[in-house]
Amino acid sequence: RFGDIHVAASSKDENFTYIPRKFDIRPDAQYLHICTNNTIFGTRYNFLPKTDVPIVADMSSEILSRVINVSDYAVIYAGAQKNVAPAGVTIVIARKDLVDDKDNQLSCCPTMLKWSVQAANKSLYNTPPCFSMYVAMLVFRHLKKIGGVKAMEEINNKKAALLYDFIDNSKLFKNYVRKEDRSIMNVPFVTGNAELDAKFVKEATEHGLCTLKGHKLVGGMRASIYNAMPVEGIKA
C-alpha cells in the first residue's frame, strides 16, 4: 500500500543468526530501512551499510542503549516501550528537509502519521499520551544524572558481557548468534532440548527469574536486558 518493497539483504540462510554485510540496493531505491536490533533473534547492527541512499532505522528496542551518530541517518524512529516509557509514545528524529518535503508525501498516508503535520503542531495534533511522556521525562533526567547515553552504554556492555560469558562457558546453554553481531539488549539461548528448555523456564520463574521464555517463533529462552535491568539482575 505504501511502497514497492525490495529485500536488499537477509540472513535467513542461517536462521537470522548474523547481520548480512552485502546489500543489493536497487538503483531507484528512495531509502534503505533497517531494524538496528532484532529482539527475536538477538542480533544488532554494529555497522552501517555503505550506500548513498538515505538510511531509515527502527531503533525501538535499543534507543538510548548506546551512543550513535544521529547524522548518519535520514530518519530514526522508536517506540518508547523498551527503554524510554510505557507504550504510547513514538520518538521520531528526521532530517528537516524530509519533514518539510510536502510535495513527495504519499497521499494515502494517514494525516496523523505525516511528520510535517506533527512538526507543525509540535507533536500536539491529537491528544498526547501524557503519562507516557511524563515517564519519558523522568527517564531522560535519570540518564543525564548517571552520565548520559555513554554511561548507559558502558553499563549495558557490562551486563551483556556477564551473560554471554556465562552462556559461552556453559555446558548446558548455547547462543547461536555470531559474536560480532550479538545484541546487548536481547540474549536468546537454548539447551538443545525443548522439554529441558520448558523445565528451565518453569523452575526459573519459581525462583523469581521471570519472562525468560523465548519468542514463539524460535522457542528456547531469551533474556531481555534493557536499560532498566540492573547489573545485579544479571548476576542473579
Walk through the language-model features, giving the residues of each:
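Active-site C-terminal subdomain of aminotransferase-like
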Residues: A80-D165, R178
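Conserved PLP-binding catalytic core of the aspartate aminotransferase-like
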Residues: F173-A204
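Active-site phosphate-binding strand-loop segment of PLP-dependent enzymes
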Residues: S10-I63
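PLP-dependent enzyme catalytic core of the Aspartate aminotransferase-like
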Residues: E206, H215-A236
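A short linear hydrophobic-aromatic micro-motif
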Residues: L172-Y176, G208-G214
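Membrane helical hairpin/interfacial module
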Residues: R1-G3
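Conserved active-site segment immediately N-terminal to the catalytic lysine
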Residues: V56, V70-Q81
